[in-house]
Every structure is written in structure tokens, then in C-alpha cells.
UniProtKB/Swiss-Prot annotation:
Lineage of source species: Bacteria, Bacillati, Actinomycetota, Actinomycetes, Mycobacteriales
Reported function: Together with its co-chaperonin GroES, plays an essential role in assisting protein folding. The GroEL-GroES system forms a nano-cage that allows encapsulation of the non-native substrate proteins and provides a physical environment optimized to promote and accelerate protein folding.
Organism for this UniProt entry: Mycobacterium ulcerans (strain Agy99)
Transmembrane segments: none
Sorted UniProt keywords: ATP-binding, Cell wall, Chaperone, Isomerase, Nucleotide-binding, Secreted
Name of the featured protein: Chaperonin GroEL 2
Gene: groEL2
Length: 541
């Protein structure tokens, strides 16, 4: 395909036009008085959102240079969303301010590489200042306030704080759509996985269609169990102990399954067979998690263990197991707390080293099942459009709350960035590097000014007033009052604020040092087909 090339100022201005088109659509959503954006969908109802990354993803521009500029800013929003779960609009506003101020200086003759170095040093200094000023999140109320700001709804913030209080910081909080109106919170006690009983004959509570085993032995097998002679030696020992048995294996079939079912129906022996969750290596890892949680061992030929020679000491234990058609819950496994802590540390290290979002998500789920718990927030709304928008807001708020617990919080509303400006005076820079630091100085005011503008206030006046206020005091845009924002519950996770700044600066540096842009040449539209009537007049239809 033919390419088109732009150089120097033309290239940079083309990229900037694309950045501005995207940023102008995104920044109207910033702050408590920000507006929504409606996104057309080819299929189904349109989406209404105030989430920066969702808006950015939908924007496709026609001009090839503008398209590349917009794609670069999409990367800012996406990276910030991946790392912190929020702050995508702030990142976009910062990127726009840095690029605008930077290109003005490049056009005036500044060296782009010097500017880039200055921007990087200034951002490093501001990040250091933000981390030093961060306050640890210690109370349920602080978590609720942080989540409420992200979601724009206090009731959502309260529910997320309650969920985190119940499942702990390592727990998983998922958001599901509900058929009922409003919000509900469901908590899972113990480890739950999405496999149920193999046969309906195992049910012990016909009304609820579930099998409940009190104080059972738990047999974990990495292979299929099909012949009864493999199981018999172990079954006899379990029956003598007078306890029920839960078998979790790759599969239980044939005469082994028949024997278990017949004994259950006759009332001789209570047991339930369940397929192990997952596939391949993930299944092995999850079985090992269960073994550590219940204090048992996985019967596997890889470690030299077989069913025929298995002893009762290899079985795990739990206070209670509840099995439905679709899922199994192990409550209070009898595993050693040190072994569980070691396994948790191992999974956490795997999360740190994982490059795949999917793998990271699955590891996070395993971590939650071992270390915390699982909470499900069910969201309902009057229409499908509102439901999708609400679900998205709750998901963002959950990630925001987790980020707050991780690294602490700073004053919200763009105030923490503005109050970090004096720290740049400590940098001893000269020439273009000093100019680069000044670009950051100007850009740090942009989020606060945009929040003020969206709230119908004069941005310059608000910025001046906040600049002269004590650290942490700023505009509460929801009420229009200048106050101590942390005390008022207006806080941002420092992880979100620093990620937004770091990612914006990274892309701004690329913009400023660009000297040529190579893009695909737009294809000419095919000529319309000729008139089939041959242009004959006098034909009346």
C-alpha cells in the first residue's frame, strides 16, 4: 500500500490535531460536574459513559496523521487503566497540556530532546513528592469516599467498602448484572470453584438441590477415576472413620461412580464426586491450592502417589463443603497457615512476573480464593443502557478502591498535582531541560482547571486561589467550597494520580521528538457506477 509522509512541524501538528480531537471529547467528563458521552454501537443500544478509556477506544479519525495522534493518546488512557483502573481522563488532559506547551517551545526553537529530559526529571520529582505526601487508607469510610468519587455515587462507595471489609484486600470483588433494581452484595465463604456434583444422586438437600458434607475427608486426584478396585482400599479406611468423602478428580466415571452412587442411595456411605476445575497446568495448580488449603496431598503419578497405595493421611479436611449443580464451596480448610501463606507469596510473585492480562486475572482469582474471599456486587437498572453504564462505573470504582489501599491517597480534584509544583524549584536545571520542567509546571494545573471549567467556574481564578491555599486545601467541585479535601472525603489514590502523570509524560516526550510521520495513503473511493439507462430522456416511470 502507498504511504504518505509528513515532516517537521507539519507532522507534529497533524498528530496534535488528532490528540486534541480525542482529548476534547474525553475531558468533558472530568470531575463531579463532568458530562457524559454517548457512543454509537453498530449493534444494539448506544452506550452512555463518563469513562475516558471507553470513549477513547471508540474514536477513529479519517485523516491518517490525526488518526496516529489519537492512537498515541489512546495508549495513555489504556496504560493508565491497566495499571490503576482509573485516572484515564486525567491522563488524557495532562497529555494534551504537555504536548500543547511542548510543541509551542519546539516551534520557538527549543531542542526536543532537551525538553524531553527536562519533562522526565520533573515528572520523577513530582511522583516522589506525591508518594511522600500520600496518606494510608485505614478506615472503611476512607475506602467508601474514594470509591464514591470514582463512581459518582455514595451508595456504590459504601457497598464497595463493605465488600472489601468482608473479603480483605486480597479478595476478589466481581460485578454482575442483576434482573432486580438496585444494588446487592453477595459474599462467598471459603474457596469456591465452578464445578458441581457429577451425578444428581449425590444431592442431600432435595429442596435446595445441593449436597452438604459436614467435616468431610477430601480426596484430590490429578487423573480420572474409573475402576472401583483403585478406590476400595481408601474407601474402607474412610468408612471406618465414619466421615463423608468428597472426591475432586479430573473425572469420576464407570464403576467407580456407580459404586459411590449406590452406597449413597442405600445410606451406607455419604460421598460426592466433583470434576476438578480448569484445564492442563492451571488444573494442576488449582488442585495444589486445594491441597494446601485443606492440608491434604494431590494423588498424582508425577509425585509417585497412586490411589491403590494412598493412605488416609494424604486426604484433606474441611469443616463443611457445599456442592450445587454448578459450583463447590470448601469452608474452613484444615491446611497449615504457614503453608497457605507461602503459597500466597508464590502466587503473588507469579502475578508480578506475568505479561498476560488473562493469566494475571486467573492468578488473582486463585490468590483471592486462598487469601481472602469472593464478593459479588449485583447491579440492576431500569434500562439496558443504564445497566451497562452503572456496571462499568462500579468496576472502575472497585479498582480505584484497591489502588487506594495499595499505595495510599492524596487530595483529589487535581489539587495534589498543583500543590506538587513547588517541589520543582528543588531541581537545578538549565537551558532546554529547565524549559521542559516548566512545561510540566504548566501542565500540572490542567486537571484542576478542567474540573473547574466543567463545574461552570473560571479556571484561572480557581487555580490561583488553590495555589495560595495550604497543602491539601482546594476546591470541592461538587459543593463549590474551598476546604481540606481529605477531611471532606475528596481523595484520589496516589497510584492513579502518579500513573496518569507518568503515562502522559511518556507519550508527550514521543510527540515532541517526532520529526516525520509515515502513514497509509487514504484509498480513493471507487467511481460510482454509470447510469444503466444510458442517459436516455423521456422515460417516465
Amino acid at each position: 500500500m502507498a504511504k504518505t509522509i509528513a515532516y517537521d512541524e507539519e507532522a507534529r501538528r497533524g498528530l496534535e490535531r488528532g490528540l486534541n480531537a480525542l482529548a476534547d471529547a474525553v475531558k468533558v467528563t472530568l470531575g463531579p460536574k463532568g458530562r457524559n458521552v454517548v457512543l454509537e454501537k453498530k449493534w444494539g443500544a448506544p452506550t452512555i459513559t463518563n469513562d475516558g478509556v471507553s470513549i477513547a477506544k471508540e474514536i477513529e479519525l479519517e485523516d491518517p496523521y490525526e488518526k496516529i495522534g489519537a492512537e498515541l493518546v489512546k495508549e495513555v488512557a489504556k496504560k493508565t487503566d491497566d495499571v490503576a483502573g482509573d485516572g484515564t481522563t486525567t491522563a488524557t488532559v495532562l497529555a494534551q497540556a504537555l504536548v500543547k506547551e511542548g510543541l509551542r517551545n519546539v516551534a520557538a526553537g527549543a531542542n526536543p530532546l532537551g525538553l524531553k529530559r527536562g519533562i522526565e526529571k520533573a515528572v520523577e520529582k513530582v511522583t516522589e513528592t506525591l508518594l511522600k505526601s500520600a496518606k494510608e487508607v485505614e478506615t472503611k469510610e476512607q475506602i467508601a469516599a474514594t470509591a464514591a468519587i470514582s463512581a459518582g455515587d455514595q451508595s456504590i462507595g459504601d457497598l464497595i467498602a463493605e465488600a472489601m471489609d468482608k473479603v480483605g484486600n486480597e479478595g476478589v470483588i466481581t460485578v454482575e448484572e442483576s434482573n432486580t433494581f438496585g444494588l446487592q452484595l453477595e459474599l462467598t465463604e471459603g474457596m469456591r470453584f465452578d464445578k458441581g456434583y457429577i451425578s444428581g444422586y449425590f444431592v442431600t438437600d432435595a429442596e435446595r438441590q445441593e449436597a452438604v458434607l459436614e467435616d468431610p475427608y477430601i480426596l484430590l486426584v490429578s487423573s480420572k477415576v474409573s475402576t472401583v478396585k483403585d478406590l476400595l482400599p481408601l474407601l474402607e479406611k474412610v468408612i471406618q472413620g465414619g466421615k463423608p468423602l468428597l472426591i475432586i478428580a479430573e473425572d469420576v466415571e464407570g464403576e467407580a461412580l456407580s459404586t459411590l452412587v449406590v452406597n449413597k442411595i442405600r445410606g451406607t456411605f455419604k460421598s460426592v464426586a466433583v470434576k476438578a476445575p480448569g484445564f492442563g497446568d492451571r488444573r494442576k495448580a488449582m488442585l495444589q491450592d486445594m491441597a494446601i488449603l485443606t492440608g491434604g496431598q494431590v494423588i498424582s503419578e508425577e509425585v509417585g502417589l497412586s490411589l491403590e497405595t494412598a493412605d488416609i493421611s494424604l486426604l484433606g479436611k474441611a469443616r463443611k463443603v457445599v456442592i450445587t449443580k454448578d459450583e463447590t464451596t470448601l469452608v474452613e480448610g484444615a491446611g497449615d497457615s504457614d503453608a497457605i501463606a507461602g503459597r500466597v507469596a508464590q502466587i503473588r510473585a507469579e502475578i508480578e512476573n506475568s505479561d498476560s492480562d488473562y493469566d494475571r486475572e486467573k492468578l488473582q482469582e486463585r490468590l483471592a480464593k486462598l487469601a481472602g474471599g469472593v464478593a459479588v456486587i449485583k447491579a440492576g437498572a431500569a434500562t439496558e443502557v443504564e445497566l451497562k453504564e452503572r456496571k462499568h462505573r462500579i468496576e472502575d470504582a472497585v479498582r480505584n478502591a484497591k489502588a487506594a489501599v495499595e499505595e495510599g491517597i492524596v487530595a483529589g480534584g487535581g489539587v495534589a498535582l498543583l500543590h506538587a509544583v513547588p517541589s520543582l524549584d528543588e531541581l537545578k536545571l538549565s537551558g532546554d531541560e529547565a524549559t521542559g520542567a516548566n512545561i510540566v509546571r504548566v501542565a500540572l494545573e490542567a486537571p484542576l482547571k478542567q474540573i473547574a471549567f466543567n463545574g461552570g467556574l473560571e479556571p484561572g481564578v480557581v487555580a490561583e486561589k488553590v495555589r495560595n491555599s495550604p497543602v491539601g486545601t482546594g476546591l470541592n467541585a461538587a459543593t463549590g467550597v474551598y476546604e481540606d479535601l481529605l477531611k471532606a472525603g475528596v481523595a484520589d489514590p496516589v497510584k492513579v494520580t502518579r500513573s496518569a502523570l507518568q503515562n502522559a509524560a511518556s507519550i508527550a516526550g514521543l510527540f515532541l521528538t517526532t520529526e516525520a510521520v509515515v502513514a497509509d495513503k487514504p484509498e480513493k473511493a471507487a467511481a460510482p457506477a454509470g447510469d444503466p439507462t444510458g442517459g436516455m430522456g423521456g422515460m417516465d416511470f
